[in-house]
């Protein structure tokens, strides 16, 4: 699933490890999501959206 996590992280000066710690997953999980190798669970998608104060639909594009 396409996403703009790298851009959102960069805007906040966050590393993958920083984001992973903030949402309670491993850095490898964030890396896999960013590279479109893993689709996050609904719970994780909500946690990511909350971290960036946006809607899930604004962050993830299923196309």
PLM regions: where:
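Short basic helix-loop element that most often maps to the first helix and adjoining turn
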Residues: 3-22
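Residues in the helix-turn-helix
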Residues: 18, 29, 58
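Recognition helix of helix-turn-helix/homeodomain-like DNA-binding domains
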Residues: 25-38
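DNA major-groove recognition helix of helix-turn-helix/homeodomain DNA-binding modules
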Residues: 43-58
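Short amphipathic recognition helices of helix-turn-helix/homeodomain-type DNA-binding modules
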Residues: 59-63
